[in-house]
């Protein structure tokens, strides 16, 4: 069992109030010495969170480190993919242009960059201008420190759920970085494509760990608490699997159904808490669990097809 999960079963289940992003980030950084690896950090961060928003932020940062192991634990980062048209390869209009002096010029705009307003480094997805022929554009990821000349971050309106977690519009005009800022490998196949799977795994780990702490603190039924633990073990194990593999995607689809059932089972427990602020936040933030549901269903369907099997009927 992941040592971080053992800690969740033994530590006092009270969490301190987290005031803002800076306060959460200080707490998350402090977990590094006691949480070895991205899955452990997702669990530890979720358990320490006083609400779903900070659990989500913890899972998101853990997912980035699972995707990019060289990313410093002490650097708040944001993955900049989505643009005005969406996040598919053909939607990416941001360009990365190699210059004669060996530098790279980045131009474009991103939207809904999670934790963007508070990040110290942005991981920006763009198409190589020299490879703009027919077919899927060649995407790369550039690591850009904040601030950098030519980079402007605009805070976007809060979302209706987890409004504590800020998002940014990222504007790039004649932004220049060294060629060494490019991460190795294809930007889509190595980073964008697997990130949804990795993010689903680590954000769910964090939210389940948050719910486990609340269940212990509120002395909710043992069967519910034990199911949370079992599901955390399941997701912790899945987080070690190949994020590209169809078998991982099929198993993740089933695991997410189990997690969502637990979220539904938690609803009457929160309702019984009355006007408790934590319960009211949970009701508000529950919409987070339905985001990208269609994309997850499509991922599972494609996984079955890649396995040469007919997808099961039903949801």
Q: How would you name each of these model-derived features?
A:
Residues 99-101, 127-131, 146-149, 173-181:
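Short loop segments at secondary-structure junctions
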Residues 64, 142, 211:
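Residue-level signal for inorganic ion chemistry
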Residues 154-238:
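Glycine-rich beta->alpha junctions and the first turn(s) of the following alpha-helix
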Residues 75, 90, 118-120, 138, ...:
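A generic structural signal for well-ordered coil/turn residues at beta-strand boundaries
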Residues 1-41, 201-315:
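Alpha-helical interface subdomain recognition
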Residues 2-114:
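Glycine-rich flavin
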Residues 89, 114-116, 151-153, 179-182:
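Short helix/loop capping segments that flank catalytic or ligand/cofactor-binding pockets
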Residues 107-146:
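DPxDG-like acidic metal-binding loop motif
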């Amino acid at each position: 069992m992941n040592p971080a999960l053992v800690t969740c079963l033994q530590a006092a289940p009270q969490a301190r109030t987290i005031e803002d992003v800076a306060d959460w980030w200080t707490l998350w950084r402090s977990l590094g010495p006691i949480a070895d690896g991205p899955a452990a950090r997702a669990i530890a961060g979720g358990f320490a969170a006083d609400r779903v928003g900070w659990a989500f932020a913890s899972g998101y940062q853990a997912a980035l480190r699972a995707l990019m192991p060289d990313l410093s634990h002490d650097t708040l980062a944001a993955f900049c993919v989505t643009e005005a048209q969406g996040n598919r390869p053909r939607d990416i209009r941001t360009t990365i242009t190699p210059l004669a002096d060996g530098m790279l010029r980045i131009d474009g705009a991103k939207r809904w960059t999670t934790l963007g307003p508070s990040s110290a480094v942005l991981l920006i997805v763009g198409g190589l201008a020299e490879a703009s022929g027919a077919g899927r554009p060649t995407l790369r990821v550039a690591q850009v420190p904040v601030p950098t000349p030519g980079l402007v971050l605009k805070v976007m309106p809060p979302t209706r759920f987890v409004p504590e977690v800020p998002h940014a519009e990222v504007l790039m005009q004649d932004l220049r970085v060294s060629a060494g800022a490019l991460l190795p490998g294809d930007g889509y196949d190595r980073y964008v494509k697997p990130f949804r799977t990795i993010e689903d795994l680590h954000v769910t780990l964090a939210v389940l760990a948050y719910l486990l702490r609340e269940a212990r603190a509120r002395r909710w039924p043992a069967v519910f608490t034990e199911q949370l633990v079992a599901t955390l073990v399941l997701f912790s194990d899945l987080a070690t699997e190949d994020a590209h593999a169809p078998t991982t995607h099929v198993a993740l689809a089933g695991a997410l159904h189990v997690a969502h059932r637990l979220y539904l089972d938690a609803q009457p427990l929160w309702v019984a808490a009355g006007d408790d602020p934590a319960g009211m936040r949970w009701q508000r933030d529950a919409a987070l669990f339905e985001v990208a549901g269609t994309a997850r269903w499509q991922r599972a369907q494609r996984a079955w097809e890649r396995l040469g099997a007919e997808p099961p009927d039903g949801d």
